[in-house]
Structure formats: structure tokens, C-alpha cells
């Protein structure tokens, strides 16, 4: 292993600086598995033993050079000469037979604890005791060590499409993969996706994207000031979003339209995690019926779930909640088929009782936002995203001070949709049932929802502050009820099953 220190980059330092006792900057994934038929009863023990006997390679063997002083100007990654794999690889059990809700309880507790930054900042937990002899793997890692793209590549290389393959190394035996230009050119197909398109990317979008945009809005705007056309497009787009309310622009969501909400408060260190999984074909069929994308349908059922969840808490605002979405769009000046990563705001329709009308409201707002972005060149898109998010700095300051401003907020929560593997994957013959992203929350963002597609399903990972949003599992259940309501209202054969 190399003994050369590697300096942290600006984005990595941002996540490190954001670390606190209540805003932990680790992200993760929860993956339940079904063992193959005839698997030995000690299968999980064998996996754990194999893991602990494995060689660990960089970056998994790296720790901070100055863990006691995170703001050190020469903070670097160095090899941990006292690396203890027993500390990083752990085994625990549910009271058998455990269900998905019971699995969410230990994952919530594990995600509530900060990583020890005196050690390489990652852990993997093998959890047994799920009904039917199933088990789960929960992984968490600090976002300053592994970005989402790299983490996904390593996890994917630990799995196989062949159920009989037992040769794939575990993720911490895999060195950092390279990144080709083609990997960043994922087509959105009209949908909303997280920047790089991977299992863990987008988990830190609310911090990296918004924090970076807010802090750098001046420089970004300055970079296009000399380009007359870009400046004109930017000014026009901001006027359309912030000031115009006529028919053509009434569905555009501006940066001061989000209501004050319980989601936008200070948070504690305690977390609650919940999951849901739906067939993609079901969401696709509903979307086709109403000329909506899969992502629109997903947002609509999240809005329906939040409407009931907040109403039961007595915290449902009269106006609709506003969501921030990372998107990929094709700029008008790009003739090569490339995409630009941007940010839009959209309604969740939480003020609408009818599920079909709610979906229509969501679809209208996302369609208007993406159409506006497509009318701009790449420079204007980046500057527009920065300007749209700039008022979030005031929202965050308001949350931290406890003083509500007289004007609306910028947004209430972040939702990311991350395209994942299309094929069923296996770990030593055990079939991966789902891959749930476990994101992060922050002050003024007590809830984050990250979606990931996998083998014909859409997996929802809900992470929230336990003290702000008690009984978060109910929100996950209510999204399912909202989906059923949409299917029933549709009336098309097969959509209600």
C-alpha cells in the first residue's frame, strides 16, 4: 500500500467541514439478500469470516492525517498503520423472524452514530434474522472518503449477474476504479435523475449541490456576465420563474414559494430510516395513462404520502410543499448529445386532495421547469440553478437562528432519483432483493427521499430526523396508499394490483 499522503479536494473538505454532532456527513446503502436454496445455516458467518480475512486496499485503508482538527489546512488521507478490520466489519441479528420494519430500526440507530474519523471512515454491517432465512448488508461511509459514483462502482463490482459466481472480491478489496467520459453521459429520457447516475450519488446532493451553489453564486454569475446571450437568457428565466404568473409561466416554481414547514427546522442526531419498493411497470403504466414520467408519478405519491403524514401531525401547510430536484437536461447549444446537470424546483401537490389532480400539478411544474432549462445554453443553466438556490442561504440562517422570515422558503425537501442496475445481482449466490439509498439530512432539511431503480423495481429510501418526524415508517406506507389511489382512479386494467 502507498504511504503517500493524498490531499483532500474542495468538495471532500466541504463534507468534512459540514460534519457536526447533529449533521453527520456519512451516506450508505441497505441491501437485503435471499440465500440460494440449500445454503448452509452458517452462510452469513462464512461471509463475515471471509470479509475479516480479506486484504483491504486503498481508499478503504485510509484515515485522516489530522482527525482531531478537521479544519487543518493540510488535511490529507494517509494509510492507517493500525488498521483493524474487526472494527469495520460487524455482524448483528434481529429477533427472528424479522420484517422490513424491524430491519429499519437497527439501520436507523446505526445511521444515527457518527463515524470515528480517527479511523478509515466506513463500516459494513451484516444483519441476520430476517424472515425466510434472509439477511441484509448495511454499508455507511463518509462522503469525504468516497463519492457516490466511486462507491457505486465498487459495490457493483462486488456483485455478479451469475448466481453461481463466487469469485467477485468484496468492495473493500477493490481499488478506486477509473471514470470514463461515457459514464457521465447518462440520458435522462425526460426524467429527473441525480447527477452521475449511481447507487450512492445524489445522497449528498442537498449539501454538496446547494451549499456549493449558494456559496459560489457570485462567481458563477460573474462567469457568464460577459456572454450577452447567456446573460439575457438567465435574466429572462429568472423573471419568468420569480415574477411572471400568466398562463405560460404559472406552473414554474420560483425560489420563494415554499411554505414554512416542520421539515425546515433544526435537527438532532437521531435518525429514522424507512423503505418502500414498487414495480417500475406499475408506475410506468400510470404515467402513460396521464402523460407523465415515472419520476412525476413517484413525486406525486410522495406528495400524497406527505399530505396524510403531515396532516396527522397537525403540520400540513395550506400551500403545497416544494421539492428541489437534481436533473440532467440537454442545453440548446449542445450539438453532441451531452447533458448539463442542473437544479429545479417543483410542487409536490400536498395541497391537492385528488390524486389525479395532484399528479397533474406535479407534471405541469416539472415539465415547465425542464422546458425553461432546455431553452438556455449550458452557462446560463448553471447560473440559473445557482441563482434559483441563492435564497436558501437565508432559509438556512433562519432555521439556525429560530426566527422565521416573513417571506416563504426556497424548498422543503430534496428528492433524488438514481438509475441503478437493470439486472438481478448476486453476492456469492445470494440474490439481492433491493438496494435502498440511505442519505443524509441537515438543518432545515429534516427529510430526504432518494430513489433508486433496480431490476425492474423502484426503491425508496426515506431518511429523517427522528425527533422532528416521529413514526417515519408511516410516510413510507402512505406512499403505497397514494399509489393505490392513483391506480384506482385510473381505472385501467391491472393497475390496481
Curated annotation (Swiss-Prot):
Catalytic activity: an acyl-CoA + a 1,2-diacyl-sn-glycerol = a triacyl-sn-glycerol + CoA; di-(9Z)-octadecenoylglycerol + (9Z)-octadecenoyl-CoA = 1,2,3-tri-(9Z-octadecenoyl)-glycerol + CoA; hexadecan-1-ol + hexadecanoyl-CoA = hexadecanyl hexadecanoate + CoA
Keyword Acetylation among UniProt keywords: no
Single Gene Ontology BP annotation: biological process involved in interaction with host
Active site: 143
EC code: 2.3.1.20
InterPro entries reported in the protein's UniProt record: Acyl_transf_WS/DGAT, O-acyltransferase_WSD1-like, O-acyltransferase_WSD1_C, O-acyltransferase_WSD1_N
One Pfam family hit: WS_DGAT_C
GO terms for MF: diacylglycerol O-acyltransferase activity; long-chain-alcohol O-fatty-acyltransferase activity; O-acyltransferase activity
SUPFAM superfamilies: CoA-dependent acyltransferases
Record key words, sorted: Acyltransferase, Glycerol metabolism, Lipid biosynthesis, Lipid metabolism, Transferase
Pathway(s) annotated for this protein in UniProt: Glycerolipid metabolism; triacylglycerol biosynthesis
Keyword Transferase carried by entry: yes
Protein name per its UniProtKB record: Putative diacyglycerol O-acyltransferase Rv3480c
GO cellular component labels: plasma membrane
Induction (record text): Constitutively expressed at a low level, it is not further induced by hypoxia or nitric oxide exposure.
Family affiliation: Belongs to the long-chain O-acyltransferase family.
Function comment: Upon expression in E.coli has a weak triacylglycerol synthase function, making triacylglycerol (TG) from diolein and long-chain fatty acyl-CoA. Also functions weakly as a wax synthase, as it incorporates palmityl alcohol into wax esters in the presence of palmitoyl-CoA.
EC top class, as a word: transferase
Amino acid at each position: 500500500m502507498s504511504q503517500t499522503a493524498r490531499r483532500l479536494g474542495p468538495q471532500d473538505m466541504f463534507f468534512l467541514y459540514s460534519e457536526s454532532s447533529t449533521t453527520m456527513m456519512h451516506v450508505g446503502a441497505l441491501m437485503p439478500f435471499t440465500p440460494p436454496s440449500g445454503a448452509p445455516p452458517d452462510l452469513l458467518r462464512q461471509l463475515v469470516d471471509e470479509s475479516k480475512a480479506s486484504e483491504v486496499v486503498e481508499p478503504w485503508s485510509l484515515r485522516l492525517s489530522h482527525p482531531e482538527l478537521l479544519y487543518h489546512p493540510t488535511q490529507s488521507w494517509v494509510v492507517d498503520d493500525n488498521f483493524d478490520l474487526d472494527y469495520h466489519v460487524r455482524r448483528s441479528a434481529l429477533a427472528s423472524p424479522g420484517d422490513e420494519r424491524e430491519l429499519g430500526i437497527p439501520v436507523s440507530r446505526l445511521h444515527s452514530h457518527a463515524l470515528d474519523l480517527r479511523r478509515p471512515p466506513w463500516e459494513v454491517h451484516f444483519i441476520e434474522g430476517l424472515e425466510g432465512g434472509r439477511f441484509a448488508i448495511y454499508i455507511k461511509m463518509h462522503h469525504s472518503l468516497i463519492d457516490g459514483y466511486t462507491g457505486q462502482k465498487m459495490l457493483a463490482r462486488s456483485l455478479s449477474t451469475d448466481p453461481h459466481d463466487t469469485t467477485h472480491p468484496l468492495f473493500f478489496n477493490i481499488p478506486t476504479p477509473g471514470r470514463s467520459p461515457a459514464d457521465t453521459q447518462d440520458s435522462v429520457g425526460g426524467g429527473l435523475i441525480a447527477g452521475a447516475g449511481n447507487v450512492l450519488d445524489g445522497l449528498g446532493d442537498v449539501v454538496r449541490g446547494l451549499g456549493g451553489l449558494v456559496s459560489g453564486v457570485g462567481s458563477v454569475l460573474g462567469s457568464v456576465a460577459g456572454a450577452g446571450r447567456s446573460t439575457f437568457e438567465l435574466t429572462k428565466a429568472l423573471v419568468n420563474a420569480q415574477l411572471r404568473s400568466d398562463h405560460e409561466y404559472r406552473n414554474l416554481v420560483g425560489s420563494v414559494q415554499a411554505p414554512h414547514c416542520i421539515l425546515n427546522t433544526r435537527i438532532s442526531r437521531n435518525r429514522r430510516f424507512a423503505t418502500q419498493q414498487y414495480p417500475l411497470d406499475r408506475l410506468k403504466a400510470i404515467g402513460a395513462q396521464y402523460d407523465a414520467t415515472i419520476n412525476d408519478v413517484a413525486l406525486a405519491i410522495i406528495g400524497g404520502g406527505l399530505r396524510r403524514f403531515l396532516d396527522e401531525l397537525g403540520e400540513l401547510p395550506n400551500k403545497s410543499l416544494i421539492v428541489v430536484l437534481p436533473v440532467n437536461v440537454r442545453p440548446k447549444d449542445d450539438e453532441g448529445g451531452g447533458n448539463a446537470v442542473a437544479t429545479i424546483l417543483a410542487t409536490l401537490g400536498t395541497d391537492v386532495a385528488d390524486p389525479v389532480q395532484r399528479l397533474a400539478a406535479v407534471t405541469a411544474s416539472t415539465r415547465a421547469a425542464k422546458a425553461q432549462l432546455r431553452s438556455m445554453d449550458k452557462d446560463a443553466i448553471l447560473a440559473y440553478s445557482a441563482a434559483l438556490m441563492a435564497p436558501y442561504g437565508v432559509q438556512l440562517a433562519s432555521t439556525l437562528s429560530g426566527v422565521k422570515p416573513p417571506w416563504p422558503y426556497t424548498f422543503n425537501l430534496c428528492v433524488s432519483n438514481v438509475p441503478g442496475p437493470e439486472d438481478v445481482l448476486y453476492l456469492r449466490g445470494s440474490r439481492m432483493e433491493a438496494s435502498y439509498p440511505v442519505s443524509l439530512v441537515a438543518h432545515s432539511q429534516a427529510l430526504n427521499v432518494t430513489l433508486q431503480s433496480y431490476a425492474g423495481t423502484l426503491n425508496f429510501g426515506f431518511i429523517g430526523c427522528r425527533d422532528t418526524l416521529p413514526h417515519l415508517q408511516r410516510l413510507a406506507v402512505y406512499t403505497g396508499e397514494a399509489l393505490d389511489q392513483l391506480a384506482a382512479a385510473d381505472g385501467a386494467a391491472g393497475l390496481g394490483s
